[in-house]
Amino acid sequence: LPGVLGFKPSVLLLTTGYALGYGMMGLSGAELLLSVSFFLVGIAKGSAMNACTILVSGNSADRTRGMNLMHSCYACGALLCPFLIAAAARVSTELAVFLLAAMGLVLWLVYVFTPLHGGKSKSSTEKEAIDWSFLWSARFWLLTGLLFFQNAAEQSVNGWMVTYFKGSGIIAGTLAAYTVTVMWGATLVGRLLIAFVFPFKKPRKAMVGMSVLCTVFYVLLVMAHTQGAAIALLFAFAISMSGLNPTAVASAGRMTSVTSMGIMLPVASSGAILMPWTIGMVAERAGLAAGMASNIVPCVGLSLIHISEPT
């Protein structure tokens, strides 16, 4: 799309999905309309992530620090926004949804008044020539595979851990609902530490270490039988994985473009769709404990990817 409309017009067009999607959710509960609304919100989210990735990558002297700082902002929003929306929902569900629509409109206005450039030498409206050379890069596909497994492992824990903890009785009551808060809190802490306190001098070795640690902590997590151990291991798992996504994207280096990110991020995000679905299928046949155990596969995949990655 940027090759036809230009970078900024493309971003402005696609990010309207936040305001439109959430606005439609607040106005109607019709199933078809809700499906369209969620689709628009998903398009807007993908566009915003792609745009921010391109902008940060193209304007950062240290890509790894820049990407971790950007993803820290993402984690901060994911940590705090649910509390704001929950407070609004106490008044009415419609108010909560319209508040999300208003936030989407604010984001769109930020893009309107911000000079957007698809790179250091590209104007915001310039129609970019598409370079497909990254498709023949083994490093590009290995990084995409790494992100695929990271998304699969992380979103499976986000989506299923509350159900698993409640069903197994490991964490009872309202505390189980705050496990996602623990994850996002750990993620925020980890990314800020990488950005400002412990910057990576050798990103590849750092990613290997993070991959191994998140695998170890996940194995221990599914073996936990007490509330304290489960919370501590969940925090450790999340903080060990926190820097993988931004560091992997930053490692794309010169391959970072509107087109390459438009392929890398959606392909990687499919892991967040397939693995939670797989856990559900396994859980139906063998129980939720077996389903959660199957999430060890993408965790191990993170480590195996590095064996094939060129140095």
PLM feature segments, named:
Residues L69-L116:
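Helix-loop-helix hairpin linking two adjacent transmembrane segments in secondary transporters
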Residues R204-A248:
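C-terminal transmembrane helical hairpin of 12-TM major facilitator-type secondary transporters
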Residues L1-G26:
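Conserved MFS/SLC helix-loop-helix module at the cytosolic interface between two early adjacent transmembrane helices
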Residues L1-G6, G190-K202, A283:
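Helix-to-loop junctions at the C-terminal end of transmembrane segments
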Residues A138-T181:
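Extracytoplasmic gate region of multi-pass secondary transporters
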Residues S303-T311:
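Residue-level detector of conserved catalytic or cofactor/ligand-binding positions
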Residues G6, L27-L32, A61, A224-H225:
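Helix-breaking motifs and short loop linkers at transmembrane-helix boundaries and internal kinks
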Residues F38-S72:
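Cytoplasmic helix-loop-helix junction between adjacent transmembrane helices
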